[in-house]
Amino acid sequence: MFNVATGLFCYLQRPSIEDADTLLEWLQDPLLQDKVFGMEPDLQQAQETVQHWIEENAELFGAENIVLIAKHSKKDIPIGLVMLKNIDWRNRSLDIHYLIANEAHRNGPYGPEMVLTTLVYIFQSLNFHKVYGYVYNNNLASLNMANFAAKEEGILKNYTYVNNNWLDYHLYSINQQDFKVFLDKNKNTFLRHHFKKGLIH
């Protein structure tokens, strides 16, 4: 399976049948069901979801949704998922969702690296215009990361009820031009190794 995009710490691939067992395990993880997927699928539903992801990803262009699996650059083990949703090929926009499913890699550089690698793929390979992201107000790590590079478009107050609390939903966006400015601003600091290795241009 070829790499869709490559970063320093991870690379992205379209999931294949070889990834089915891993995806099935993630779909049945209680933490991910509660925090990410928002559902508790039984085994058959989970199997159908995995099959749909693999079949949908066989189509290179034109799909409304694309699922990418992130793998560790050195260990070649699956560490997370990137989901591109509501893809508007005409207006060149989409929504991005990501998760570190492998518990051992939820800390460290993997989350930011997955997002950076995905944005490079979206803007430099697919030539999209704008990306939207959504973050709950209790996800401080993702909020900090979003505020670092993206613009907050608005807040959906008291959007969902979780563990006896109402959570707000923050909407962020970044367009291709702003991403270019972000890369240029940081090319001599924390992105210097990405540029040196030709991972970003």
PLM region descriptions:
Residues M1-A20, Q28, K71, K75-H201:
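Acyl-donor (CoA/ACP) binding surface of acyl/acetyltransferases
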Residues L31-E55:
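Conserved GNAT-fold acetyl-CoA-binding loop/helix
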